Each structure stands twice: as C-alpha cells, then as structure tokens.
C-alpha cells in the first residue's frame, strides 16, 4: 500500500564495503537478506566500483529505493537519482539528506512532459513500469528528457545506470543521446520478456521483433561495445540463448564499455 507516514524507519546495511541506510519496511526484508549476503547484483557493484571515482558523476535512472545510488555516493563525485514511483520518491527524499552529494529527481525518462506509470502489485516495488503490463494502480509522473537529467550533473566524466523495466526499448533514441556527453560507460537493464509481452500479434512475430529491437539496442552507442551478464559469453550468445531459444525471453544487464 502507498506510504502514508512522513517518516519511515531505517536500517543500516553493509553492502560491498560501504554502509547504506535503507527503509525498514517488511516488504523489503527478504531482499535485504540477499543484499547482506552479497547475492544481489554483485556484478553491478563491481562495474560501479570500476567506473566511479571522486572525479566521476553517477546518474541512476530508475533508482528505486536508493540501493546503488546511496552506495555510489561513497565513491562518486556526485549522484543523480532519477525515480518516478511515488513511494520510492518519498523514500529517496527522506533518506538522501544523509548523503550530501545525492540529488533526487522525481520523474521518468520520457519524451513528453508526463508519462503514465503502472505498478506491478503496488507502488514501491522494483517493477513499476511505463509499459502497460502491470496489474496494480497507475499514476501520472513527470517526464524528463535525457538533457534535463544530464543537466543536473556538473561538468566531467559520468557513468549512467538505467533500469526502467522494459521501457528502455521505447526510450532508445533518448538513451542514444548519452554519446554527446563525457560518458565513461553505461549499464542498462534490458527486459525482452516485458517487451514481447507488450507487443501484439502471433508469438513468432513478437519474438522476431523482440530480437531485432534488442540487437539494435546493443548497437545504441557508437564507440562502445555491449557486454551481457556472465551467463552469456557474448552479446550474440545473449540474443541466441537468452531470447531466441527460450520459451520466455530472459533479461540481462548490458554494460557498455568504451572501445579503446
């Protein structure tokens, strides 16, 4: 259910060498067990540790409850946490004063002035999406172009992380604008299963369209190459075994490294 209290109790958790403060809410307790055990997105923290330093800004588009944003505040010059989910925004705004170099932007990556978000179950989860695939309530959120988001980061190198639950495909042209900036790299979660679910037509056609759009997404940033999660040996392996040959496509985090 939506947050009704202006203040949420907090808990401190050690995550890959840094302590972060998060909301002490029952719905997140199982997740926190995984986080404490180092079993949640270990590769993400390795990637952030490699790319962030005191000269580099971090932009987190789809910041959820602040796990990676607050962790990055210990190592990055500044952090821009972008989040449209109303419950998550309330959490971020309450907790961010503990991290002076973190700025919260309430809104979603979009082309227009606003965008409708759909909850999966309820708001506050990590699955809120702009795709019309949720089974919960919906809300209108402020739309933020990539220029508005990147304008919040001061001059200097930047690393961008994006996790917007399937809407990354629709926002590909906005994300591609990142090549105009001093981009050290990017990590973007791709959700082909959500894309395929949102498409119409027979399954073979939807699967083909999903494959094509994902292939195009891997080539989004000229001068960078996309590397999927460890279970795949290459981007082609992800297309083949993660999408084409699976009953339901699987997602992965694509890390875009600058070519030498």
Task: Label every PLM stretch briefly.
Residues 1-260:
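Phosphate/nucleotide-binding beta-alpha loop and adjacent structural elements of enzyme active sites
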